[in-house]
């Protein structure tokens, strides 16, 4: 008749000793090394406490339809300008040119958020005028919601010049987010939810592009045009307006943030346990060798009771 194993379990052998013995001291040392050493190893290997993390998010970006346009019309420094701010237009005087503007935001991937801005500006020029340089400042509403809620006003600055007069400028780029410090992991961040340009101010310094950019760059959170590809077209027909075409994409951003308490603990716990398992395996085999071979004297308790005959 053939036999086979239907069930198996390990036999538990106990080793007993008094409190004040070398075996007790050995067990205490092993326990300390088993559970404290992994903590030291994980901490000294750097990155134990998670201080900074990141995630991807598609921002909610809306063009605010506020802009400042400056153009140089000859080599002597004559210029034309226009903006959506009445006070600025009054300061320009005879250099004011009112353009035709068409703006459209599209949701390419149908996720409910705009992905690209298509902007078309047609600037009228006098017959004797030519366009050598263009500066264009656009404002946007920028929002994030996945971790902390960020609501702010941002801008994009476009600039291009050429020694040869042109008839059209085409610009293509991505509106990218800049962070100087990580965001908090939760809460409302609306410090920069104010207009980048104070349209109610009657002073010319308020609309100076140098001042606007200088103050804007002092912020922790800003946006800029990245990967800009300008195309300058020459050969303008008489009495034809100068055309500005911009295609600005709103890409998915990698947002840096400071992790919360529980995320930090979770990350540290994973590192600690991964090292702890190695120490548990090593010291378990060391203890088994020590007590099985009675290197330290103990009383062995067999796994089965001895029955009297």
From Swiss-Prot:
<keyword id="KW-0812">Transmembrane</keyword>
<keyword id="KW-0966">Cell projection</keyword>
<dbReference type="InterPro" id="IPR019306">
    <property type="entry name" value="TMEM231"/>
</dbReference>
<keyword id="KW-0472">Membrane</keyword>
<comment type="function">
    <text>Transmembrane component of the tectonic-like complex, a complex localized at the transition zone of primary cilia and acting as a barrier that prevents diffusion of transmembrane proteins between the cilia and plasma membranes. Required for ciliogenesis and sonic hedgehog/SHH signaling.</text>
</comment>
<dbReference type="GO" id="GO:0036038">
    <property type="term" value="C:MKS complex"/>
</dbReference>
<dbReference type="GO" id="GO:0032880">
    <property type="term" value="P:regulation of protein localization"/>
</dbReference>
<comment type="similarity">
    <text>Belongs to the TMEM231 family.</text>
</comment>
<dbReference type="Pfam" id="PF10149">
    <property type="entry name" value="TM231"/>
</dbReference>
<keyword id="KW-1133">Transmembrane helix</keyword>
<feature type="glycosylation site" description="N-linked (GlcNAc...) asparagine">
    <location>
        <position position="220"/>
    </location>
</feature>
<dbReference type="GO" id="GO:0060271">
    <property type="term" value="P:cilium assembly"/>
</dbReference>
<feature type="glycosylation site" description="N-linked (GlcNAc...) asparagine">
    <location>
        <position position="193"/>
    </location>
</feature>
<dbReference type="GO" id="GO:0007224">
    <property type="term" value="P:smoothened signaling pathway"/>
</dbReference>
<keyword id="KW-0969">Cilium</keyword>
<feature type="transmembrane region" description="Helical">
    <location>
        <begin position="267"/>
        <end position="287"/>
    </location>
</feature>
<comment type="subunit">
    <text>Part of the tectonic-like complex (also named B9 complex).</text>
</comment>
<dbReference type="GO" id="GO:0060170">
    <property type="term" value="C:ciliary membrane"/>
</dbReference>
<keyword id="KW-0970">Cilium biogenesis/degradation</keyword>
<keyword id="KW-1003">Cell membrane</keyword>
<feature type="transmembrane region" description="Helical">
    <location>
        <begin position="23"/>
        <end position="43"/>
    </location>
</feature>
<protein>
    <recommendedName>
        <fullName>Transmembrane protein 231</fullName>
    </recommendedName>
</protein>
<dbReference type="GO" id="GO:0035869">
    <property type="term" value="C:ciliary transition zone"/>
</dbReference>
<keyword id="KW-0325">Glycoprotein</keyword>
